[in-house]
Protein backbone atom coordinates (compact mmCIF):
# COMPACT_ATOMS: atom_id res chain seq x y z
CA UNK A 1 0.00 0.00 0.00
CA UNK A 2 1.64 3.23 -1.16
CA UNK A 3 -0.42 5.52 0.99
CA UNK A 4 0.94 6.38 4.41
CA UNK A 5 -1.33 6.00 7.35
CA UNK A 6 -0.35 8.83 9.66
CA UNK A 7 -0.99 8.92 13.35
CA UNK A 8 -0.23 11.21 16.20
CA UNK A 9 -1.68 11.79 19.53
CA UNK A 10 -1.92 14.67 21.84
CA UNK A 11 -3.53 12.80 24.59
CA UNK A 12 -6.08 11.69 21.95
CA UNK A 13 -5.61 14.05 18.98
CA UNK A 14 -4.09 12.72 15.74
CA UNK A 15 -1.85 14.42 13.08
CA UNK A 16 1.26 13.48 10.93
CA UNK A 17 5.07 14.06 10.52
CA UNK A 18 8.58 12.50 10.36
CA UNK A 19 11.67 12.16 12.56
CA UNK A 20 15.37 11.23 12.29
CA UNK A 21 17.01 8.56 14.47
CA UNK A 22 20.50 10.06 14.70
CA UNK A 23 20.10 12.44 17.66
CA UNK A 24 18.38 10.27 20.31
CA UNK A 25 20.15 9.70 23.63
CA UNK A 26 18.87 8.89 27.13
CA UNK A 27 18.11 11.97 29.23
CA UNK A 28 20.42 11.61 32.24
CA UNK A 29 21.42 8.49 34.15
CA UNK A 30 18.39 7.91 36.38
CA UNK A 31 17.46 4.26 36.91
CA UNK A 32 20.02 2.91 34.42
CA UNK A 33 20.20 -0.88 34.15
CA UNK A 34 22.15 -3.30 31.95
CA UNK A 35 18.97 -3.66 29.85
CA UNK A 36 18.65 0.13 29.49
CA UNK A 37 22.22 0.34 28.18
CA UNK A 38 21.15 -1.77 25.18
CA UNK A 39 18.02 0.25 24.26
CA UNK A 40 18.17 2.06 20.92
CA UNK A 41 15.44 3.48 18.66
CA UNK A 42 15.93 0.46 16.38
CA UNK A 43 15.53 -2.28 19.03
CA UNK A 44 13.07 -0.92 21.58
CA UNK A 45 10.48 -3.52 22.71
CA UNK A 46 10.23 -5.65 19.56
CA UNK A 47 8.06 -8.30 21.25
CA UNK A 48 4.26 -8.24 21.08
CA UNK A 49 3.24 -5.69 23.75
CA UNK A 50 0.01 -7.23 25.07
CA UNK A 51 0.00 -11.05 25.28
CA UNK A 52 -3.74 -11.06 26.00
CA UNK A 53 -4.39 -9.33 22.64
CA UNK A 54 -2.06 -11.33 20.34
CA UNK A 55 -2.80 -10.96 16.63
CA UNK A 56 -1.19 -12.95 13.79
CA UNK A 57 -0.38 -9.70 11.95
CA UNK A 58 0.79 -6.63 13.84
CA UNK A 59 3.18 -3.70 13.56
CA UNK A 60 4.93 -1.97 16.43
CA UNK A 61 4.97 1.83 16.32
CA UNK A 62 7.74 1.97 18.94
CA UNK A 63 10.67 4.16 17.98
CA UNK A 64 11.35 7.85 17.57
CA UNK A 65 8.40 10.21 17.31
CA UNK A 66 8.34 14.00 17.40
CA UNK A 67 6.95 15.56 20.57
CA UNK A 68 5.96 18.98 21.85
CA UNK A 69 4.90 20.25 25.26
CA UNK A 70 2.48 23.18 25.13
CA UNK A 71 0.03 24.90 27.46
CA UNK A 72 -3.03 22.64 27.66
CA UNK A 73 -5.27 25.14 25.83
CA UNK A 74 -2.82 25.79 22.96
CA UNK A 75 -3.55 24.84 19.34
CA UNK A 76 -1.84 21.93 17.58
CA UNK A 77 1.84 22.91 17.42
CA UNK A 78 3.27 23.79 14.00
CA UNK A 79 6.82 23.05 15.18
CA UNK A 80 7.71 20.25 17.59
CA UNK A 81 10.26 20.42 20.43
CA UNK A 82 12.32 17.36 19.51
CA UNK A 83 12.32 13.57 19.52
CA UNK A 84 10.93 11.12 22.07
CA UNK A 85 11.53 7.38 22.15
CA UNK A 86 8.16 5.62 22.29
CA UNK A 87 6.94 3.69 24.34
CA UNK A 88 8.73 5.45 27.21
CA UNK A 89 7.02 8.19 29.23
CA UNK A 90 8.25 11.75 28.70
CA UNK A 91 9.50 11.78 32.32
CA UNK A 92 11.68 8.69 31.73
CA UNK A 93 15.39 8.88 30.98
CA UNK A 94 14.90 6.36 28.16
CA UNK A 95 12.40 8.64 26.42
CA UNK A 96 15.32 10.92 25.66
CA UNK A 97 13.35 13.83 27.15
CA UNK A 98 13.29 13.34 30.93
CA UNK A 99 10.90 16.21 31.58
CA UNK A 100 8.08 16.46 34.14
CA UNK A 101 4.68 17.72 33.03
CA UNK A 102 2.29 19.84 35.04
CA UNK A 103 -1.53 19.76 34.98
CA UNK A 104 -1.32 22.88 32.80
CA UNK A 105 0.71 21.10 30.05
CA UNK A 106 -0.39 19.16 26.97
CA UNK A 107 1.94 16.57 25.43
CA UNK A 108 1.72 16.11 21.64
CA UNK A 109 3.21 13.21 19.65
CA UNK A 110 3.64 12.98 15.87
CA UNK A 111 4.86 10.22 13.52
CA UNK A 112 4.36 8.60 10.10
CA UNK A 113 4.27 4.89 9.40
CA UNK A 114 3.54 2.69 6.39
CA UNK A 115 0.73 0.16 6.43
CA UNK A 116 1.93 -3.15 4.93
CA UNK A 117 0.47 -3.75 1.46
CA UNK A 118 -0.85 -7.15 2.62
CA UNK A 119 -3.21 -5.26 4.95
CA UNK A 120 -4.96 -3.43 2.10
CA UNK A 121 -8.73 -3.56 2.60
CA UNK A 122 -8.44 -4.91 6.16
CA UNK A 123 -9.63 -3.23 9.33
CA UNK A 124 -6.83 -1.73 11.42
CA UNK A 125 -6.76 -1.20 15.17
CA UNK A 126 -4.34 1.21 16.85
CA UNK A 127 -3.50 0.73 20.54
CA UNK A 128 -1.89 3.47 22.61
Regions found by a protein language model. Give the residues of each.
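Positively charged n-region of N-terminal signal peptides that target proteins for export
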Residues: 1-4
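Low-complexity, intrinsically disordered short segments enriched for Gly/Pro and polybasic residues
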Residues: 6-8, 98-99
